């Protein structure tokens, strides 16, 4: 699987403070808010992944291929089990994220060129969803507030 580590700040508020943004300014700048939200989710996912049994070296990575397919997070255990997660601030972007996850699954797991096993699950983590739900076989939408220890 062509994954790469991606670097994030330990606390996304550091970047927001460095930009001199207060909460109102951040809410007006949806792109920066989305980047800070992704950083927040990644921080939490890194902590949760480290607590998993059979965790490998650099278990949380980013996927991008030459065809432009991007997936925000791949979590892989040492035994080869893996999950793919997209991170989207708003519910409006869930369909695009689900399509990216489906494309990743088709590319890596199906057809003559398949080189890896099916993911254990795939999910879209959102900022403003009302509830967690299953949108397709093995694909879930999970509001960030549902990610608790």
Question: Would you name each region that the model predicts?
Answer:
Residues 125-149:
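Domain-level recognition of nuclease-like catalytic cores that cleave nucleotide substrates
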Residues 76, 81-93:
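Active-site ExK catalytic segment of metal-dependent nucleases
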Residues 118-126:
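Short, hydrophobic beta-strand segments that form beta-sheet elements in well-ordered domains
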Residues 12, 87, 127-128:
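Residues immediately flanking
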Residues 17, 94-95, 131-136:
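Switch/connector loops and helix/strand junctions flanking conserved nucleotide-binding motifs
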Residues 51-54, 103-118:
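Arginine/glycine-rich "motif VI" loop of SF2 helicases in the C-terminal RecA-like domain
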Residues 90-110:
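Mg2+/Mn2+-dependent nuclease catalytic core
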Residues 1-81:
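Accessory nucleic acid-recognition modules appended to NTPase machines
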């Amino acid at each position: 699987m062509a994954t790469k580590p991606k670097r994030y700040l330990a606390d996304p508020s550091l970047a927001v403070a460095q930009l001199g943004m207060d909460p109102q300014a951040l809410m007006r700048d949806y792109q920066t808010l989305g980047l800070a939200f992704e950083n927040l989710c990644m921080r939490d996912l890194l902590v949760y992944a480290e607590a998993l049994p059979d965790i490998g070296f650099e278990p949380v990575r980013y996927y991008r291929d030459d065809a432009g397919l991007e997936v925000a997070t791949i979590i892989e255990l040492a035994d080869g089990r893996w999950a793919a997660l997209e991170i989207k601030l708003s519910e409006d972007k869930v369909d695009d994220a689900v399509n990216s996850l489906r494309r990743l699954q088709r590319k890596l797991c199906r057809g003559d060129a398949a080189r890896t096993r099916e993911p254990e699950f795939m999910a879209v983590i959102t900022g403003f969803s009302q509830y967690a739900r299953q949108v397709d076989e093995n694909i879930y939408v999970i509001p960030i507030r549902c990610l608790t220890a």
